Amino acid sequence: MISSKDGIIGFAIGDAMGVPVEFTNREKLMRNPITSMVGFMGHNVPKGTWSDDTSMTLATMDSITKANGNIITNDMADKFLEWMEQGKYTPDGKIVDIDRTTLRALGKYKTTRRSAVNCGCTSNTDNGNGSLMRMLPIVYYSYLNWLEQDKILKLVAGISSVSYTHLRAHETGAYLV
């Protein structure tokens, strides 16, 4: 049986292969496909460097495992702050990227210390894929705990709301899980 570790490693490898060509248009990639690790392109980082997607996935996984399998969104937000401010969960102690919505939400959490689920951004333009990228640990969590669809939607909404409170982010995350 494939373990959750295999999925996380596969996620990190895929992310590291995509980082150099992030924001590259499809036509250019069709002419010059990525078939191995490369570096020093879009984000000007060495090959094998992963992005915020993997870092936040690792932070999510760390939060769940250190909380004995519980979901504690404030702890998760604290781990995200460690990543954002200290470079934890990165290959070299430096963050590669952070989207504006996540930056604003974590800034609000740090400043107010309100419940993390009340710090996510609510605008119609704050519905990117940022929370979707950290759902793999939630897939494992939901599977291991035999969660039904209504509980998955509630769980995903809470976790997404640390940065993204828009309904689209919640529904797409729940659909993935």
Please name every model-derived segment.
Residues 1-52:
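An N-terminal structural lobe/cap that precedes and organizes the functional/catalytic core
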Residues 165-174:
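Conserved small/polar residues in nucleotide/adenosyl-binding loops
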Residues 17-25, 72-75, 146-150:
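Short, well-structured active-site flanking segments
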